[in-house]
């Protein structure tokens, strides 16, 4: 039996890397309201910003076009990557499952470090834990796979309605732990939004991160995120197993239908979801969850289809390569967005958090992503992998791969 190896440059599919870069842009836009601490502010201080009017428009934009859509795309791409790993290692005679589980273990450790040391909004840990379930579906037929995926995506709506009508919430214990930590560290409702801005030592920042880690677990439970992520992983696995991304031309008709129906139905429903979110969920948590279920996934599929159609029509444009650069270094850039956000907005850095309107936070997010395009492009001129990608691959395959490109000629 041979040891597997990561995907080489010549084996990569630029559409997947470009889609991953596109997803990173959306994730950056979705996360920076939290990095800037704007999301933690009460309504009154938000209304005092000179940008309050455009901030409200920006919030509507985020709910309609961004919220949930790009983590959905990122999760689907993760499932596609799982299928590619298994297929490549099967061809080499390697044990794909062992390699995959090892890969997930190290992703979990990277995510855990990200969660408790940098930013409490980490998603990697959940990806790793849920990802470990994917091999259980390896032998499922395509139809069975899609049934499971649809079921997992729909379960959160049922759970939310049950919680709404019974008044019993699964995260109640986590909420207790969260407030116990707040009491212990002196984090109050009054200073909650300003704590990270005013924490000028890493030890003070670490107190909030510890409390934030518990809050993140609460968010996963309240949002039933584990079911959603597993369902999206399975859809990605189905797409990857059928190799749809290798022959987009023959799928043009299907892609056009998905694009038309996905956007014409998904975006209006996303507007209803945005109204529900902006108006404190007037129809209750369950109905808000239903709006999310219908709007976010349909719109996300529409985004993917539109992206692929544009690629087919303008595939010689430089845009695709520009988006592919950060996509090839997705792990490095995802954590890099956190490091930059901490430096700009937290007290251990420039301390700009909670002092700027939402629109400024989003403009900073766009600037960060543009920087990452340039950084990734420059890095990949000299190196085969991103820095964290290289470490992750070496740990996964238990061997040291050449990092610099001059090794390819030797």
Task: Report residues per predicted region.
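Long hydrophobic alpha-helical segments that form multi-pass transmembrane helix bundles
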Residues: 151-231, 235
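N-terminal signal-anchor module of multipass membrane proteins
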Residues: 2-78, 85
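Alpha-helical transmembrane segments of multi-pass integral membrane proteins
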Residues: 281-381
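Membrane-proximal soluble regions of multi-pass membrane proteins
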Residues: 57, 381-410
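Specific transmembrane alpha-helix
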Residues: 72-87, 125-138, 224-247, 295-314
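Internal alpha-helical transmembrane segments
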Residues: 84, 88, 92-163
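Functional transmembrane helices that form membrane-embedded active or gating regions
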Residues: 8, 12-23, 258-259, 311-340, ...
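Solvent-exposed interhelical
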Residues: 97, 135-148, 238-260
